[in-house]
Amino acid sequence: MSSILIALGLTLFAGMATGIGSAIAFFAKKQNYRFLSVATGFSAGVMLYVAFVEILAKGATALARAYGEIPGAWINAAAFFGGILLIGVIDNLIPSAENPHEVPSETQMADFRDACTLSDTGAADCDDAGRKAKLLRMGLFTALAIGIHNFPEGLATFLAALSDPALGVAIALAIALHNIPEGISVSVPIFYATGNKTKAFAWSLVSGMAEPVGALLGYLGLLFFFGNPAGGMPPQIMGILFAGVAGIMVYISVDELLPTSRAYGRGHDSILGMVAGMAVMAASLLMMK
């Protein structure tokens, strides 16, 4: 039971990072978002390294044990691309305006500020009611879209932590970092539509709570089909899940994190953050052996 609580706790930590993004949007200097470039690049490096070096390898080992080396390798590859296909379908079902992979740039956030002026108390004031409603709709639909995306991410963190708590910590940290700009994409339009920082912060936090909900539903599913997940699952199921999770993480890194990092950074901020993330993850995995 303790391993299950740790796994659920890590997904809760990762999900709450959307609230950190919301706070940054309100209190950080609006003209300097380079820290987001490095942070999201770092997160991409961690997730790519873990996906290819650790999680995909775990899937291959489990499937080879269940089906033999050659059939297991084919099933591992199929499950990997199945994970990419799954998150890709989810991604493309969501309109780009509300898609969390389309994080608002500095220019877009400047447009929000131009659309709604700030009073001396820091509250937003929109003269155009239609524009205000559009901003609110954008923020709320973005929160919903992030919630949908966070379900498989929560399951990925949960499964990794259940198998290896140290690996789960690394993945939770990477997902938490990539949830920060998603929190910004929810809170900024809601704040400039309502003038209420508390409401904007609350919605960004709620969107991240889909992460532990996804983990909890995954746990209940495993409990229903396999009894006690902490006691171990059949290797063929664990292998397919790990390979699929690796595919999901690679898609998120390439489609979301790296483009976001490039959009916010200058020069080589993005690649430096990514390499640093890979190096830290490599050192962590080596020290844990």
Curated annotation (Swiss-Prot):
How is the protein disposed in the membrane?
Multi-pass membrane protein
Q: Give TM regions.
A: 4-24, 35-55, 70-90, 139-161, 206-226, 232-252, 268-288
Q: Does the keyword Iron apply?
A: yes
Record GO terms (molecular function): metal ion binding; zinc ion transmembrane transporter activity
Binding annotation for Zn(2+): 153, 178, 182
A GO CC term attached to the entry = plasma membrane
Q: Where in the cell is it found?
A: Cell inner membrane
> Which reactions fall under this protein's catalytic activity?
Zn(2+)(in) = Zn(2+)(out)
Which Pfam families does the entry link to?
A: Zip
**Keyword Iron part of the UniProt annotation:** yes
- Which amino acid positions bind Fe(2+), per UniProt? 150, 153, 179, 182, 211
Matching NCBIfam families, A to Z?
PRK04201.1
Q: What does this protein do?
A: Mediates zinc uptake. May also transport other divalent cations.
Q: Which family does it belong to?
A: Belongs to the ZIP transporter (TC 2.A.5) family. ZupT subfamily.
Q: What is this protein called?
A: Zinc transporter ZupT
Q: Please report the organism this UniProt entry assigns to the protein.
A: Desulfosudis oleivorans (strain DSM 6200 / JCM 39069 / Hxd3)
